[in-house]
Amino acid sequence: MQITVREALRDAMQEEMIRDDKVFVMGEEVAEYQGAYKVTQGLLEQFGPKRVIDTPITEYGFAGLAVGAAFAGLRPIVEFMTFNFAMQAFDHIVNSAAKTHYMSGGQAKCPIVFRGPNGAASRVAAQHSQNYTACYSHVPGLKVVAPYSAEDHKGLMLTAIRDDNPVIFLENEILYGHSFDVPETIEPIPFGQAKILREGSSVTIVTFSIQVKLALDAANVLQNDNIDCEVIDLRTIKPLDTDTIIESVKKTNRLVIVEEGWFFAGVGASIASIVMKEAFDYLDAPIEIVSGKDVPLPFAVNLEKLALPSESDVIEAVKKVCYYSV
């Protein structure tokens, strides 16, 4: 059986709304229009306007409303049309949702999911293409999820909705329409468990979200040069499955990290720092990080392509750590 990422997310929200009447969805155009990307399709008809709520165009306003609802015991799912617009709600996410559990000594909970597309799409220019993975991962009190497959989107969304504290659920606009094979039943997937999608012995490639496809495609090409890549899909950035990464590096002795976001203070830099501390003696080459270029993402299609990680970038990085002529 195959379903799209869009359908996987919708199914997860639908199942949790049936299971728990405290769960509700809110955001711009999530009800009548059924979501800017049709992720909430059919939910208004099934659950009505009290649980599928169209909001004004004010991220600061409806994010604050949702955080208050979570403090009161409800379980809001907040859709941002894009995480670029969530900048308007940053204060509510970082200062209210993320910190209250700690500041209350564990007495107050904030069961809320902030979800929507993150990162580049296709020619939506600099202000609509930013990747916020590292930004939210930097904040104590936030769990950060960035899945690739339909099964993982659904399983991790089920877990996110049931979590008693805030989850940042980073989706990808391009992945919404991609279909994946899925089992008949998808159970909640625990946070902090990476997935080895391709076993190998020559080099470890660590990545997440849509860059997983880039890594898998590069690994297939590199196999022709007898370079056997192990590809790890992180699935969740925070908590990070450090153990799976370290064990893989101990086996392959080489590491390439692939992320769409910017290099400086990025996810890759944090992972590289951890591996250097925990597995330095196992490394046979410096760690390579493939990332987006340090520029606002251009609108021009040729420049946009050059600013984002490519399959050839991954291949070049892998050959470099394997001391292979390029």
Swiss-Prot record:
The keyword rRNA-binding does not apply. It catalyses: N(6)-[(R)-lipoyl]-L-lysyl-[protein] + pyruvate + H(+) = N(6)-[(R)-S(8)-acetyldihydrolipoyl]-L-lysyl-[protein] + CO2. Thiamine diphosphate binds at E59. Signal peptide: none annotated. It holds the Pfam family Transketolase_C. Keywords: Oxidoreductase, Pyruvate, Thiamine pyrophosphate. Its EC number is 1.2.4.1. NCBIfam families: PRK09212.1, PRK11892.1. Heterodimer of an alpha and a beta chain. This is Pyruvate dehydrogenase E1 component subunit beta. It comes from Rickettsia felis (strain ATCC VR-1525 / URRWXCal2) (Rickettsia azadi). The gene is pdhB.
